[in-house]
From Swiss-Prot:
Record: residues binding Ca(2+) 2: 57, 59, 61, 63, 68
Primary gene name: calm
PROSITE patterns, sorted: EF_HAND_1, EF_HAND_2
Covalent S-S links between cysteines: none
Family classification: Belongs to the calmodulin family.
One Pfam family matching this protein: EF-hand_7
CDD domains attached to this UniProt entry: EFh
InterPro entries membership: CALM/Myosin/TropC-like, EF-hand-dom_pair, EF_Hand_1_Ca_BS, EF_hand_dom
Superkingdom, natural source: Eukaryota
Gene3D superfamilies assigned to the protein according to its UniProt record, in alphabetical order: EF-hand (1.10.238.10)
Residue sites binding Ca(2+) 3 per the record: 94, 96, 98, 100, 105
Annotated ranges, domain EF-hand: 8-43, 44-79, 81-116, 117-149
Modified residues (N6,N6,N6-trimethyllysine): 116
Protein name: Calmodulin
Length: 149
């Protein structure tokens, strides 16, 4: 799994790993994971942190080492860039199926997700993704937005 990563990606993940590994001992504990999650505005319980560690902790020693971290990141990357998932997400937004996401369609979906956005905010989201400037988002633009690093 991790052997499909580029050297650049591995270097980036090493940097991320170091942010988690506060004491620099080469492993991430539940305490260190909790610190980082809270700094990102999350509020995980001790049990949730333990579950997260257990999911990744291949050797069962209760902490995450760098190879385990790499495997997790490689899995996540494989999962997120799935062409089919992006196509499905596009279909959710493109209510009338015309191949474009309009401001009205975007507002509708965001409202259903519980996000009350102003017209300005919706227009801004469209503008950010709208590469050709036609005022709506086509599939190519949507893919660009979803896969932008």
């Amino acid at each position: 799994m991790a052997d499909q990563l580029t050297e650049e990606q591995i270097a980036e993940f090493k940097e991320a790993f170091s942010l988690f590994d506060k004491d620099g001992d080469g492993t991430i504990t539940t305490k260190e994971l909790g610190t980082v999650m809270r700094s990102l505005g999350q509020n995980p319980t001790e049990a949730e942190l333990q579950d997260m560690i257990n999911e990744v902790d291949a050797d069962g020693n209760g902490t995450i080492d760098f190879p385990e971290f790499l495997t997790m990141m490689a899995k996540k990357m494989k999962d997120t860039d799935s062409e089919e998932e992006i196509r499905e997400a596009f279909r959710v937004f493109d209510k009338d199926g015309n191949g474009y996401i309009s401001a009205a369609e975007l507002r509708h979906v965001m409202t259903n997700l519980g996000e009350k956005l102003t017209d300005e905010e919706v227009d801004e989201m469209i503008r950010e993704a709208d590469i050709d400037g036609d005022g709506q988002v086509n599939y190519e633009e949507f893919v660009q937005m979803m896969t932008a690093k």
